[in-house]
Curated annotation (Swiss-Prot):
Phenotype upon gene inactivation: Loss-of-function in embryos causes arrest of karyokinesis progression.
Coiled coil: none
Function: Tudor domain-containing protein involved in germ cell development, more specifically the formation of chromatoid body (during spermiogenesis), Balbiani body (during oogenesis), germ plasm (upon fertilization), and for proper miRNA expression and spliceosome maturation. Component of cytoplasmic mRNP particle through interaction with FRGY2, and binds to maternal mRNA related to cell cycle (RCC1, RHAMM, INCENP-A, MAD2L1, HELLS) and a germ plasm specific mRNA (Dead end/Dnd1), it is proposed a role in translational activation of the maternal mRNAs repressed in mRNP particle.
Residues annotated as domain Tudor: 1-30, 215-279, 435-491, 853-910, 1060-1118
Protein name: Tudor domain-containing 6-like
CDD domains named among the record's database cross-references: Tudor_TDRD6_rpt5 (cd20424), Tudor_TDRD6_rpt7 (cd20426)
Gene: tdrd6
GO biological process, one term: spermatogenesis
Length: 1905
């Protein structure tokens, strides 16, 4: 049978064991529903409750609806008042039971009724201490409860069930000021808990929205709905209780998390669930009281100016994102409300100082406290101590971890004043016999019978007094305490004189002998202290100097450490300015909930040590960020044990703590404090004297307190009483000379002599032997003795023997269990005899222990059967006694409970004499069968003999050893007995390695969270967003540090281990910054150096091989404390981080506690270290989302040729036939080259997939589907189309291992259709490592000839990207941005033998012309093309490229970049799809191409080209066939002209249908009005034509290239947008107006078709730009005005470039202003032409601030004559000042007559700006082209093609019938070789076409040299 407690019902029963089952995991987290309660204010009549009383209570409460009022909480029990509202008269259950005679009612008057003023000292003191009674935390039951009647009094303050936060004086935290009433009353929140508050608020909102739990009257804690924002908050009702009649519908509530008070309706209240009480009230009340005072007499009345200044200070600092810090100086009750006296400051200003400077406050001279104020703590002060300063101090108390208290020498006068005031007050108060228990501040009598100031902490079983001026804690009786009157301001206002300190760079645990040495050398003598740092609780980290000796260094030497600072460097400024980083592991201390103050602020607020009349702010010489310890160092001293023994001042409202008592946490146990979340403290050191034992605050402890026993008050070891009495440090007074009494001086000189004899002497016998004669002048030194027993020391508290790995020594075997478990003694050690002498002296041990106080692991003095006493450790409790092991011998025995004694403290500093060992290479399991024989031989060889022992390895608290005697190696016994020769290891010449094999980093126990789990962690090491390390907030590296340090100190260099070490090997290494040992894994090896990763922190370090030590397997098995992370959803193969990403990320994640959610885990590198892909949040902020703005996406597209093999949709080629153009031009034949269907998906080199490092971005691979295109387009906002050469970089470097390039498989070669080409990127964009021997296969898909060629490392490459490189170039921004090299010819080739989807485009609603062919000039050719594939795709192939040849020539990859022609090929921009065939212009980037044909690098220039877009549904460019005919160049018998045409076809993108049903009215009106009204402005005069005619050169070969752009309609802004629109036209398309580029709003999706035609033997004199309007067969042959409503679907533009090989002159248009009006003439300035003998540069650019277009023409062009036709009625020559004006009227045909335009010889390019403004008629926008000259030395010009829509669309772009202007464009002006006049008579016939037109525009590029 077992007894079980039903947590959901509260009853306990005995049940059968077999009826008990394991509770499912999902039910374990649910809290118990039953609440343990106790009725308040009643007690039983007798010892216990009678059965009648219990029955009466059951009848009264069972199965009834009751109202419960929680009065307080004691342990796990709630003290409640039970009300039964069903009763008419008395509703209190306590009073009902009392009236019925079943209980005794005890009523306590509330505190509020005892706040009157009394004149005499007795009444005044009585009143003060009655005010100290805390109804929440009292040791008496009557003080734990309130009267129900008093609760009904509106003047009393009800108890709040919300748990408050508590802060000790001196603490400094970061806060948020949440509510300001006045400088005397405001509310703050702990900033470190802001994330928890946000979670709670979200939980409250969800609870109130999903649950309707009405408020029940009588409860004070509730949820209230704020009238300000409608949200629900945790609230506490302060007055106008719902139960009262007045204001029954309204209550005043305090929002406990914000401090705001508001009156709300009762209907806006809800009941609060118990789980919402878990988080403490976040707002705490603060005041500047007694730091500064207002000008008024009332210290709490502040004027509005002061309050307003306070508000401004907070608001301005919040806007500047300054950290608000708060330092706590004291705690007080102000009108019964707990308030903290604080100062709020930023790194630059303090509110106290500010208000004084502004004249709103004054420095306060303390006289007395206000009657309504009762101090709960003494004031804290830094005593004007500066960080980095130097002070003379006297140490008054030392604890086991070398934490000590000291007094400043300069405060001696203050200490004497306090002593005098104490004596005076005691004499007065003792006249009155007060029955009131003193409050937390009182006077206590020390064992020297003197009174001292103390802070009282009342526990359940004892009362502890912390003497605030000396630092020690003692137990006192109630009779030994006196209250402090309120007028004793000297005692209340003088700050505490004991300053808590600790030494810098000290370990967590210190051996007792070191502590003893420290005490003997520092107590009662003046020392100098350098202040290194200040912790958050006010403790100072110091370096101590005794004269010229640095005590820190001496201690480190005794500890066997290397001193990090040189001894004797007392005045070293660097040392003084170096802040001791106490949290080097990167985690803020978990011992408190507030941030480190000294390391985070620039000012240290100090309270004046004497008058407290102001604050002094000292600026430290060094300032570090709050978490600046992320300096990538794995310091395991994190945090050091400086926090273990801190004195805690807290006002405790929790009744379980019973009183306002600060507790000094002994270093020997962990203590749960209300104000702090502590780390687990280190184990007992056993170094504590009886005089300074400190009780634990744990309510479950078997001992709630431990008595001082007149041994050293501040000693670490018990000593002889005579020494203890005089060297102990009780509270005391200093004389002016700081001299010790003769007795103290003598005791100090005696030190620790005669310890053995004095130990057993009674302290009480000698308590008065050396009592000082003058108590006011001497330091008192005896404490009152107590009868309770302190906890015993543990085995781990003993110091360790100094044994190093590989050490050889003479030993004796003391005890043997097995060959793998025996104990030895070091022969040279003589301490064993000393121990025996101390334990077995004449007196013997007298301090017998009670068995119930002895626990496992305790060290005791045990009596053995031989009649002697030995040191032992308890290993087990048995029925017949205690099983103990004798630590100095190794054997065990059962000891009777009556034979155990306390171990003398003097023996706690001596290590255990026995050393546990095992024979190396010998295991018990391997010789179990022969164990008896083996043990016999082992005992024979080892018994009572001195042996030679070599310590090989320390593992699991046991040394593996090799024993040898005069017969040889004893380890060989294992071999002789087992008979297995394979187990015979040769005796190593150097220290042997254990049998453990070298484990890899993958064998570490990685403590990673589960997938999907969210944990709290700190970033311990940050490399980048894709690689950083985190430590869990629950990680405990302290205990691990001790083991790792111990293993490292015992290790030696092992040559065998160094030979076996490899990448992934775990090891133990010393970190160079702090000389501590840390676990690490080897990540890289090079020569004699290794790079290791500190696995518990994440940072790396490179060190010498000999510095690496073997890591024991047991330590390697301890879970790793950190784990690597990377931000989720950022793939480096798809993008990269910007340069600011690392800095921003580091600042974000190192600020504080992070919330990390693990999404994916993968192993990294050879070390197999698991890395977590995580989402990171800090203070509710999503770091992943924040980092998105620093991410630059790159398109990783699939191969369109490979995609075509698996295409699921088939599109007939008949649907994509190019009409009429093939019929017209019969100059070339269709290409016979098939599409390279075998192209690889991933670029490869010699068969190996070409991979890249983290910076590599394969940006240009095409998108295989519309879905992928839309997805990529949505996720990127960076330029992916690059526009710069790498020619110089490739030429200068023969090393191709870091070639910046982008692989693109969109561009087919002329001869190898569909062959991928390569485009250079900027050097900062891409770096791909590959071997030069693999280049051929890397680009095997570029051309079929490359399989038979080789590229050598010392040769240059031309690497280009296809014209269809990325989707993004499809938008109008690209068309306005991308500079195209016009010298490069482009041909349209057919992707035969495969089905190809649209390149980089999303599939439209229906396929359009999508075939590519080469040299298609007739219907037969088109038919041939149609038969080659079911789904054909257009690809743009740059011509005359060294890699992707436009000519039908063999590919020559080995090219001299300085001499080869046509080095640069332009990328014709493609329009990318965005969802439904539309493109976001912002996501478009530009390509920059350059063709270097026969030119040197210095002669290469960029020719800007801006492909234009369809600006509206039916706004199309019309060109007549006659214009095309005029543009045919005259035949030149010496030239060979080749025409290549490029067709770009754009699909419809959610545009109105062909019939324009969406705009019927516009069609009717506009078509009728503007039909046949298109005139063709000529931009050149006849004089221009004559001058521009190129000279005939029979040796030249002219090559015409034509570019056809077919643009489809896209979703454009509505016609309401009528603002000015800026367009870019470089070059202008024929017809006067190009497609208009839209930068922001317009987005077009293009498909591309290519037609190549060769025109040979053309006369260059007759060359003209050719315009071909091709929507159908008949449409392409007619000319004249055409209504645009018949050309709804697409516009096809074709450019034809004539090229020649001979040098020629170029007339370049320098300035051009072109204005288009719907009802006005278009004026065109003349185009000056520049003549150059070396290169023909024709650039027309549009320049706007955002982006720029580059155009570069490198070849020479010979232009003989170019004419600009003008109307006959033009009589005025507009050529003035080199300007050519041309006006176009859409209603009338106007001819333009302009003279020849000349340009300066050095002009290389021109910039034009197009401006569209609305005309009076509103039919069109005025389009102005304004030239802006660029800098002469620029390599290219920049232009912008942007359409910015604001209020509405231009009507001309919306209406499908708005005619476009026809006429020559800037390209024709600058390149045409012959005259032409556009004719529009026949264009009327085009109305009947099917809505598609193609406009072919050609220009004459420069011939090759």
């Amino acid at each position: 049978m077992v007894e079980v407690y039903f947590i959901d019902h509260g009853n306990t029963e005995m049940v059968d064991w077999y009826n008990v089952k394991k509770l499912p995991a999902e039910l374990r987290e649910m809290p118990g529903l039953a609440i343990h309660c106790c009725v308040a204010d009643i007690c039983p009549l007798g010892v216990r409750w009678s059965p009648e009383a219990i029955l009466a209570f059951k009848i009264a409460v069972v199965d009834k609806k009751l109202i419960i009022y929680v009065v307080s909480k004691e342990l796990h029990k709630y003290i409640i008042e039970v009300l039964d509202n069903s009763r008419i008269e008395q509703r209190s259950m306590a009073k009902i039971l009392s009236a019925a005679g079943h209980a005794k009612y005890e009523e306590v008057e509330p505190v509020a009724q005892h706040t009157g003023n009394m004149s005499d000292i007795d009444n005044e003191t009585q009143q003060q201490f009655l005010g100290y009674i805390n109804k929440d935390t009292s040791s008496l039951k009557t003080q734990q409860k309130e009267d129900v009647c008093s609760m009904e009094d509106d003047n009393s303050v009800p108890y709040s069930p919300y748990e408050d936060q508590f802060f000790e004086p001196g603490a400094t935290i970061e806060v948020v000021v949440s509510c300001i009433i006045s400088p005397g009353l405001f509310w703050c929140q702990n900033a470190s808990l802001s994330s928890k508050l946000e979670k709670l608020m979200a939980k409250i909102q969800d609870y109130c929205s999903s649950t309707d739990c009405p408020y029940e009257r009588g409860a004070y804690a509730c949820l209230a709905k704020s009238s300000c924002d409608g949200k629900w908050y945790r609230a506490f009702i302060t007055n106008n209780r719902p139960g009262s009649k007045a204001n029954a519908n309204q209550v005043e509530v305090l929002y406990v998390d914000y401090g705001i008070t508001e009156t709300v309706l009762v209907k806006d209240l809800r009941c609060i669930e118990s789980e919402l009480f878990d988080l403490k009230a976040q707002a705490f009340r603060c005041s500047l009281y007694n730091l500064i005072a207002p000008d008024s007499e009332n210290p709490f009345e502040w004027d509005t100016k002061a309050t307003l200044s306070f508000h401004r200070f907070v608001d301005s600092s919040a806007k500047k994102c300054s950290e608000f810090k708060c330092t706590f100086f004291a705690t007080a009750l102000v009108k019964t409300e707990l308030s903290y006296i604080v100062d709020v400051f930023t790194p630059f200003a303090s509110i106290c100082k500010l208000l004084v400077e502004l004249g709103h406050a004054k420095q306060l001279s303390h006289t007395t406290l206000a009657p309504s104020v009762q101090l709960q703590t003494y004031y804290y002060s830094m005593h004007d101590i500066k960080i980095g300063g130097e002070e003379e101090v006297y140490i008054t108390y030392v604890n086991s971890s070398l934490e000590f208290y000291c007094q400043l020498s300069r405060n001696t006068e203050t200490i004497d004043m306090i002593a005098s005031a104490t004596a005076r007050v005691c004499s007065e108060v003792r006249k009155f016999e007060l029955s009131v228990t003193p409050g937390p501040l009182c006077l206590a009598k020390f064992s020297d019978q003197q009174w001292y100031r103390c802070f009282i902490n009342t526990n359940k079983n004892s009362t502890d007094a912390f003497f605030v001026d000396y630092g020690n804690t003692e137990k006192v009786n109630k009779e030994e305490m006196l209250p402090i009157p309120s007028d004793a301001y000297e005692l209340l206002h003088f700050p505490m004189q004991a300053i808590k300190c600790s030494l810098s760079d000290m370990p967590d645990t210190v051996p007792s002998d070191v502590v003893l040495w420290f005490e003997n050398h520092v107590l009662e003598k003046p020392l100098r202290a350098i202040i290194v740092a200040k912790e958050t609780d006010g403790k100072l980290i110091v370096e101590l100097y005794d004269g010229s000796q640095q005590i820190n260094s001496i201690l480190k030497t005794k500890l066997g450490w290397k001193s990090s600072r040189a001894e004797g460097s007392f005045g070293n400024s660097e040392k003084r300015n170096q802040l001791n980083d106490l949290d080097r592991g990167g985690r803020k201390e978990t011992t408190s909930k507030f941030q480190p103050y000294s390391q985070g602020s620039k000012f240290s607020p100090d309270l004046d040590g004497h008058s407290q009349n102001g604050l002094t702010y000292q600026k430290p010489e060094f300032q570090t960020k709050e978490r600046e310890q992320f300096e990538q160092k794995p310091n395991l001293r994190t945090p050091r044990s400086y926090n273990n023994d801190r004195e805690v001042y807290q006002v405790q409202k929790n009744m379980s703590q019973s009183g306002f008592a600060p507790q000094k946490t002994g270093g020997f146990r962990s203590k749960d404090r209300e104000a702090f979340e502590q780390r687990p403290n280190l184990k007992a050191s056993g170094l504590y004297s009886q005089g300074r034992e400190t009780p634990s605050m744990s309510q479950n402890s078997s001992y709630s307190g431990f008595p001082p026993q007149k041994t050293g008050a501040f000693r670490s070891k018990e000593r002889q009483v005579s020494e203890h009495k005089q060297n102990s440090n009780p509270p005391k007074f200093y004389n002016q000379e700081r001299k010790l009494s003769p007795q103290l001086r003598k005791a100090s000189q005696n030190g620790s002599s005669s310890q053995t004899e004095a130990f057993w002497s009674s302290g009480s016998d000698q308590s008065s032997e050396h009592k000082p004669d003058n108590a006011s002048q001497q330091r008192r030194s005896t404490f009152q003795e107590s009868k309770l027993t302190p906890p015993l020391s543990k085995l781990s508290d003993l110091p360790k023997q100094n044994i190093a790995l590989g050490m050889k020594s003479s030993v004796y075997v003391a005890h043997t269990n097995t060959i793998s478990d025996f104990y030895v003694h070091i022969a040279q050690n003589t301490d064993l005899s000393n121990i025996s002498e101390i334990l077995n002296n004449e007196k013997g041990p007298s301090d017998q222990l009670d068995e119930k106080y002895v626990n496992l692991g305790d060290l005791i003095c045990a009596f053995y059967e031989d009649g002697l006493y030995y040191r032992a450790v308890i290993t087990e409790k048995c029925a017949d006694g205690l099983l103990a092991q004798y630590i100095d011998y190794g054997n065990t025995s059962v000891i009777p409970p009556t034979k155990i004694y306390k171990l003398p403290p003097s023996l706690l500093s001596i290590p255990a004499m026995s050393i546990c060992c095992a024979l190396d290479k010998c295991t018990t399991s391997a010789c179990e069968q022969n164990m008896d024989d083996l043990m016999l031989k082992f005992s024979e060889r080892t018994g009572d003999l001195e042996l030679s022992c070599e310590f090989v390895q320390y593992n699991n608290r046991k040394w593996n050893v090799i024993l040898c005697d005069d017969q040889g190696c004893i380890n060989d016994l294992f071999i002789s007995v087992s008979g297995d020769p394979m187990l015979n290891p040769p005796l190593p010449k150097e220290p042997s390695v254990t049998s453990e094999t070298l484990i890899s980093a993958s064998l570490f126990v990685w403590n990673l969270p589960e997938l999907g789990e969210t944990v709290e962690a700190f970033a311990s090491a940050v490399d980048s967003p894709e690689h950083f390390w985190c430590q869990l907030a629950t990680a405990n590296v302290d205990s691990l540090a001790v083991k790792v340090q111990e293993a490292g100190e015992h290790s030696i260099h092992d040559g065998r281990f160094s030979a076996e070490i490899e990448v992934g090997s775990p090891c133990n290494v010393i970190y160079s910054d702090d000389n501590y040992w840390y676990r690490a894994a080897v990540t890289k090896m090079k020569d004699d150096k290794v790079t290791v990763r500190f696995v518990d922190y994440g940072n790396e370090e490179t060190l010498q091989m000999e510095q690496v030590r073997r890591l024991p397997a047991d330590i390697a098995a301890i879970p790793v404390q950190a784990f690597p992370c990377s931000l989720a959803n950022f793939n480096l193969s798809e993008g990269c981080w910007s340069s600011e990403a690392n800095t921003f990320f580091y600042d974000k994640v190192t600020e504080g506690l992070l919330e990390i959610t693990v999404l994916h885990i993968q192993e990294l590198g050879l070390c197999k270290i698991p890395q977590a892909s995580v989402n990171v949040k800090y203070n509710g902020e999503d770091i992943n989302c924040e980092m998105r703005r620093f991410w630059q996406d790159s398109f990783v597209n699939t191969n369109p040729f490979t995609e075509s093999l698996n295409a699921k949709e088939e599109t007939a080629i008949e649907d994509n036939v190019i009409p009429s153009q093939a019929d017209e031009d019969d100059h070339s034949e269709p290409s016979e080259e098939p599409c390279a269907s075998e192209s690889i998906e991933t670029p490869a080199v010699d068969g190996e997939v070409l991979t890249a490092n983290d910076e590599t971005k394969l940006e240009a691979l095409p998108v295989s589907s519309a879905e992928e295109a839309a997805e990529i387009t949505d996720n990127t906002d960076v330029e992916l189309m690059r526009t710069e050469y790498l020619l110089h970089e490739v030429q200068k470097s023969s090393d191709l291992s870091c070639l910046e390039l982008t692989l693109d498989e969109d561009v087919p070669d002329e001869k190898n259709s569909g062959t991928p080409a390569v485009t250079p990127l900027a050097a900062e964009d891409l770096c791909i490592d590959y071997d030069e021997s693999n280049i051929k296969k890397s680009y095997s898909g570029v051309t079929t000839e490359m399989d038979n060629r080789e590229l050598h490392q010392d040769e240059d490459l031309d690497l280009w990207t296809s014209a269809a490189q990325d989707q993004e170039i499809a938008s109008s921004e690209i068309l306005g941005d991308v500079p195209i090299d016009k010298e490069c010819n482009y041909s349209v080739e057919e992707a035969t033998d495969q089905s190809c989807t649209n390149i980089g485009l999303e599939e439209g609603p229906e396929p359009v012309e999508n075939a590519f062919t080469e040299n298609i000039n007739d219907e037969t050719d088109i038919a041939n093309v149609q038969s080659k594939g079911e789904e054909e795709e257009a690809y743009l192939v740059p011509e005359e490229s060294t890699v992707a040849e436009c000519e039908i020539e063999d590919f020559e990859p080995e090219v001299d970049l300085q001499s080869k022609e046509n080095e640069g090929l332009p990328d014709i921009p493609l329009l990318e799809g965005d969802g439904d065939d539309s493109v976001s212009p912002e996501e478009v980037s530009s390509h920059e191409m350059n063709e270097a044909e026969g030119l040197e690098d210095q002669d290469q220039e960029l020719l800007g080209y801006t492909g234009t877009e369809r600006a509206m549904d039916d706004y199309e460019v019309l060109q007549s066939e006659e214009q095309a005919e005029d543009l045919v160049p005259e035949e030149d018998p010496g030239t060979e002209t080749e025409h290549r045409s490029y067709l770009f076809e754009a699909e419809e993108a959610d545009l109105p249908s062909q019939e324009h049903k969406d705009f019927p009215e516009q069609e009717e009106d506009r078509v009728a009005e503007h039909k046949n009204d298109i005139s063709e402005p000529d931009l050149q005069s006849k004089e221009q034509k004559e001058d521009l005619v190129p000279e005939e050169d029979p040796g030249t070969e002219t090559e015409h290239r034509s570019y056809l752009f077919e643009a489809e309609e896209t979703d454009l802004p509505s016609q309401e947008h009528k603002d000015t629109v800026t367009y870019t036209d470089i070059p202008l398309l024929e017809g006067g107006v190009d497609d208009f580029g839209s930068k922001e709003t317009v987005s077009i999706d293009y498909n591309y078709e290519y037609v190549t035609e060769d025109v040979e033997d053309l006369d260059t004199e007759n060359q003209e730009s050719q315009i071909c309007i091709s929507g159908s067969d008949n449409r392409s042959k007619e000319s004249g005005p055409v209504d645009l409503q018949d050309f709804e679907d697409e516009v096809l533009f074709q450019y034809t470039e004539p090229t020649a090989d001979s040098a020629s002159d170029v007339r370049q248009g320098d300035e051009c202003e072109f204005a288009a009006h719907s009802d006005e003439n278009i004026e065109s300035p003349e185009h000056p032409v520049h003549t150059d003998s070396t290169a023909d540069v024709c650039e027309t650019d549009v320049c706007e601030p955002e982006v720029a277009d580059h155009c570069h023409l490198q070849d020479k062009v010979v232009s003989e004559r170019t004419e600009c036709p003008v109307p006959d009625d033009r009589t005025k020559d507009d050529h003035q000042n080199n300007e050519c004006q041309c006006a176009v009227d859409p209603v009338e045909n106007i001819e333009c007559q302009t003279p020849v335009c000349l340009v300066a010889a050095d002009r290389s390019y021109t910039e034009y700006t197009w401006t569209v403004s609305e005309t009076e008629s509103g039919n069109m926008k005025n389009i102005e082209f304004q030239e802006s000259p660029a800098e002469g030395d620029s390599v290219g010009s920049h232009g912008v093609g942007a359409t910015e829509w604001k209020d509405g669309e231009p009507e001309s772009l919306v209406n499908p019938d708005t005619p476009l202007l026809e006429g020559p464009v800037s390209v024709d002006i600058m390149h045409s070789s012959d005259n032409f006049e556009p004719e529009t008579d026949d264009m009327e016939q085009m109305e009947q076409d099917q809505g598609r037109m193609k406009i072919e525009s050609s220009y004459v590029p420069a011939p090759s040299v």
